[in-house]
Amino acid sequence: MAQGAWPAIWMLAEEERYGPYPKNGEIDIMEHLNFEDKIYQTTHSYYTLNLKQTENPPHGATTPVKADDYNIYALSWYPDRLVFQLNGKETFVYPRLNGVDASQWPYDQPFYLIIDQQLGGNWVGPVDLDHLPVEMAIDWVKLYQ
């Protein structure tokens, strides 16, 4: 952990089926900021970012985490919902809604996984050089279909 550290496990669509970002969606399985004791689990799409529909349904949640420990982050992806988990416990569900703009559910196409450790940015603020180097330790990754 460090000021300006932004480790993340997230997903983007393999192709631009619906047009440029954010029309194909983004799934943030885990984002952690600085020294916070929580993670962010969020969905982004044209529906949430451009149409500002962040509460119908809620597009994300925060969950307490022990950031110095190993944690198991999971996403179970179903045709009608995304189910986020932390250490085997369900933390957030993003459902597919009927009767709303079609951009609410771009999650009907293949996505790829990104695991990265970003430094700095508008959300996390500047990097404190005294906190370098930073790391995100990963013990294992499991994908199944």
Task: List the predicted regions and their residue ranges.
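GH16 jelly-roll
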Residues: 1-145
